[in-house]
């Protein structure tokens, strides 16, 4: 660990040497290679060895100390690391892998060396925490004579461009210039958020976190910042609506047309993604209007508990409740024909969390979200009795659905909190399906449904959002949801009941 100054006066000498894999190399001070010295450098074992500290080579530029603690033992066999090979004439010192550390106060690490090539030298972006300027110059980051290849100095981040120059004294200066996020990002889905971030550039945690090393990392970070990947909560709400339909349809009649069903946490049927579980109750009241017409009223409520998001960029349910309201009408005709109409309204009030995790960032943004779902379904069906107790019902029809997703304001994630506006989605789907019902005489029964159909029409509004660290400017959200696809549903259930016991298994 170097907390002061290391001066190298001999040829082919090095400031640091790593003998094993369990130690640390730390440079919080300066390293000076004396005039006339050749073949020397920072690390004896080569560039792949990590040096920590303010003037290390890992780009972190954070002061660290290990000497106050018990130093690790050197293992019996040393690690094999490829060493840098000196030039044939031994005339140049090796700086490849050296990172010029910069700090929020505008200072930069300095290296004194003569007869050296600056190929492989880079500059980190620690300075961005202290300034909102998009162009900053650091003087004399490398001092000495016969310094070559200053123009090859690079930035540790794709967001910044480093331009090295040699001044009149022979020392090397570096100017760091910010690139536009729109010029660096290659994913078209993040273009609008990149534009907003460019317009609102300043020095805060959000912008510092975007100083990543590769274009792929920037694309991923911008997607997480925009919230476009946070889709699980509302998708799970749709799944929950289907679960209520199944629970209500399977409800056994208690008396006078009243049916009741319940499922509780701990039951495999009461599980959603991200370890979310729920308690759900379903009530159904059936009324006979005429000899050929029936009416059913449905109500249900569910209480949810979950662990939130388990995927970077996505969201997940942490709690909340849902309510379900249904009205069904059936008209029977001769020869087993039926005309079925159904109206549903579901409302979901959910607590959620969104994960933002890239680089050194690990944030959780909490929110309260609301989704309302309205559906009208009309279909014609014909029932065929294959044998006693076994019926098959093919059906076809159309479904109109409208979803309204409320706006929300996130909290607890600082600069990464999103303010999202409301959005809507309207679609018309065709329906073609087949139902199978079996009722045995020994207490066993089974049912299965296979349904599918193409989307006929789809319209959705454009959702926009703003992120706290970039001010109030808004950008478009592209969640990848489009119409024109094929919708499908498959369910199956087996039930056994007797006076002493009951068993029910459902799959979907």
List each model region and its residues.
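Surface-exposed loop/turn motifs in large extracellular/passenger domains
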Residues: 1-13, 17-94, 107-119, 145-150, ...
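Polar/charged side chains located within well-ordered beta-strands of beta-rich proteins
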Residues: 2, 17-18, 27, 44-45, ...
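Outer membrane beta-barrel translocator domains of Type V secretion systems
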Residues: 207-388, 482, 504-508
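Residues on the lipid-exposed face of transmembrane beta-strands in outer-membrane beta-barrel proteins
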Residues: 281-287, 325-331, 345, 376-382, ...
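Solvent-exposed, glycine/polar-rich loop segments of beta-barrel outer-membrane systems
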Residues: 311-316, 351-368, 404-426, 456-485
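Outer membrane beta-barrel transmembrane domains
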Residues: 323-327, 420-508
């Amino acid at each position: 660990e170097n907390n002061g100054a290391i001066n190298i006066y001999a040829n082919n000498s090095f400031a640091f040497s790593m003998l094993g894999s369990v130690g640390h190399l730390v440079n919080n001070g300066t390293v000076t290679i004396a005039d006339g010295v050749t073949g020397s450098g920072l690390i004896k074992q080569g560039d792949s060895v990590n040096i920590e500290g303010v003037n290390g080579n890992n780009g972190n530029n954070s002061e660290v100390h290990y000497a106050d603690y018990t130093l690790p033992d050197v293992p019996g066999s040393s690690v094999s690391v490829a060493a840098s090979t000196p030039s044939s004439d031994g005339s140049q010192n090796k700086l490849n892998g050296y990172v010029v550390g910069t700090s929020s106060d505008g200072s930069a690490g300095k290296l004194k060396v003569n007869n050296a090539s600056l190929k492989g030298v880079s500059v980190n972006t620690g300075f961005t925490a202290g300034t909102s300027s998009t162009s900053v110059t650091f003087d004399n980051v490398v001092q000495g004579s016969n310094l070559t290849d200053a123009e090859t100095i690079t930035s540790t981040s794709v967001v910044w461009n480093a331009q090295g120059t040699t001044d009149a004294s022979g020392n090397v200066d570096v100017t760091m210039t910010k690139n536009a996020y729109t010029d660096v990002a290659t994913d078209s889905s993040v273009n609008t958020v990149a534009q907003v971030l460019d317009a609102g550039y300043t020095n805060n945690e959000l912008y510092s976190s975007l100083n990543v090393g590769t274009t792929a990392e920037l694309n991923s970070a911008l997607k997480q910042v925009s919230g476009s990947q946070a889709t699980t909560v509302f998708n799970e709400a749709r799944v929950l609506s289907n679960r209520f339909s199944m629970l209500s349809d399977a409800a056994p009649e208690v008396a006078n047309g009243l049916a009741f069903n319940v499922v509780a946490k701990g039951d495999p049927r009461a599980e959603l993604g991200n370890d979310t579980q729920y308690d759900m109750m379903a009530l159904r009241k059936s009324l006979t209007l005429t000899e050929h017409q029936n009416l059913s009223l449905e109500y249900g409520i569910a209480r949810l508990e979950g662990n939130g998001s388990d995927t970077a960029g996505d969201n997940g349910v942490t709690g909340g409740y849902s309510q379900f309201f249904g009205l069904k009408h059936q008209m029977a005709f001769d020869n087993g024909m039926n005309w079925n109409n159904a109206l549903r309204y579901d409302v979901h009030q959910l607590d959620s969390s969104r994960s933002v995790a890239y680089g050194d960032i690990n944030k959780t943004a909490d929110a309260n979200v609301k989704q309302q779902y309205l559906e009208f379904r009309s279909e014609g069906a014909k029932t065929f009795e294959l044998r006693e107790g076994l019926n098959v019902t093919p059906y076809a029809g159309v479904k109109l659905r409208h979803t309204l997703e409320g706006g929300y304001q996130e909290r607890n994630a600082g600069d990464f909190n999103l303010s999202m506006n409301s959005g809507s989605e309207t679609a018309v789907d065709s329906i073609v399906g087949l139902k199978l019902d079996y009722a045995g005489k020994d207490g066993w029964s089974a049912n299965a449904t296979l349904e599918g159909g193409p989307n006929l029409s789809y319209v959705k509004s454009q959702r926009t959002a703003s992120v706290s660290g970039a001010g109030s400017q808004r950008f478009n959200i592209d969640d990848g949801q489009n119409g024109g696809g094929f919708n499908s549903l498959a369910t199956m259930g087996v039930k056994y009941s007797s006076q002493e016991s009951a068993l029910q298994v459902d799959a979907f």
